[in-house]
Amino acid sequence: MIYTWVNKVIRQNIRKRVEEIFAFSEAPIETQEQLLRGLISKAQNTTYGQLHHFEHISDREIFSKLVPLSSYATLKPYIEKMRDGQTDILWPGKIEWFAKSSGTTSGVSKYLPVSKESIEECHFSGGRFELALYCNAVPETKIFEGLGLRLGGSTQIQQEGKGQSGDLSAILIQNIPLWAELRSAPSHETALLSDWEEKLEAIIDEAITQNITSLWGVSSWFLVLFKKVLERTGKSNLLEVWPNLELFAHGGVNFAPYEQQFRELMPGTQVTFMENYNASEGFFAVQDDPSIDGMLLLLNNGIYYEFIPLDTFNGTASKTLLLEDVELDTDYAIVITTNGGLWRYILGDTVKFVSKKPFRVKVSGRTEHFINAFGEEVIVTDAEYALQATCEAMECRVIDFHAAPCYMNNETTGAHQWLIEFEQAPADLEAFKIALDLNLQSQNSDYQAKRKYDLVLELPRIIAAERGLFHQWLKEKGKLGGQNKVPRLSNNRSLIEQFLALNASLQTQP
């Protein structure tokens, strides 16, 4: 009886969500204007609202004049007050939850405020939009006759200051509504296990006998789970384990390197692949048409958007564009204002618009060079810190370096490959590798999580480059001198393959 009630509630919600999608697609600018007015009105009596004269803001242009662009570094003093239990700082009331996320240059981790509104009206709302879009596209779906298997990150919640902090997935599990929990796997108890290896085995114990009809999570984590499921069951693909599986909703990392493996694990056309774009800061977009390489920007999901052309990006001194002023196939840094208290916050991601009617985007990169092939979010400053600390400890010196991902396949786990040109090489390259790995883990908690038990990432693979490699590469590119430099991180292998080929040719020279 209770499952019949749950399914009825879900279907009613889906109809409402589909209507909302059509509404904001027809009036995107008006939707964003109305949303911004609501955010300003809600927060005008906060410390931040009073400081920046929210009471005088009547439109988007005045908003961009009175409120400065922000980064985590500029908002950190306010966030620290919120973590100390102070109220009405960036957002009304007391913030109980903080999503812990790596990627800043100001410390190991950043703590992003997660308000009640952002949980319900952004993160959960985004998931409901995705489900609604799928059901609207597949009206004969039987997805509600089974369970949705969700796979989050670490679920360790810590009491820090006057608030609770942890991975966003842990926060969402703690706040999941009853109707969603009843249609989800694994059980609440299993989802809250703090030990990842133990949790993975427990998920498999439960899920292999359940009617799983949908999968929700980061593709690199699921690849680990799927391999273990097939090992445990002896089946050749996932449809032999879950014959009614029909949806794989994925996000968090670049899916392209994994797609072929997933197609082999879920053969045929039975399973629909839907990409979503979300982060600790919010739920931004979802693929509304599987045939289109782009995601529908959610314009009434608690987030107001601005955009900075990447070729003019200058941090918090940048000039922004309104939604209606963007152009197709141009890289933009995203600026968000959210119902979690992030005001004109430079997210760090870059997107390209693939259509404007409706507004669809695809993630194109980061405002800095980075590696995020497995959800580790390693930026240049992380890598430089780890390398510097390792060199100091092992009395060696580096001229330059480049690192890129080695993707998972059926035989190997993922890894980072580092090509390092030494001025003075370490006496023991194996010890250097271990030290570099530990230093990077100490700097970046997301990398540390992916390294745990070698499930997603194994030890980095270090190659000592030939002397003069990077100078020669710059010379061949006509980029010697001036501000030209070697890109130190890449999220794909195109650049490192160039370096490796050139390195091999240098090895053959006398």
What are the residue ranges of the model-derived segments?
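Structural secondary-structure boundary motif
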Residues: 117-125
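Conserved AMP-binding loop of ANL adenylate-forming enzymes
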Residues: 132-177
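Short, basic alpha-helical nucleic acid-contact segments in DNA-binding proteins
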Residues: 126-131, 291
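Active-site glycine/GP-rich loop and adjacent strand/helix microenvironment
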Residues: 1-55, 63, 67, 78-85, ...
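Short "domain-exit" segments at the C-terminal end of structured domains
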Residues: 107-117
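Active-site diphosphate/adenylate-binding microenvironment
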Residues: 30, 34-98, 110-111, 121, ...
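A broad detector of the eukaryotic-type serine/threonine protein kinase catalytic domain
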Residues: 106-107, 368
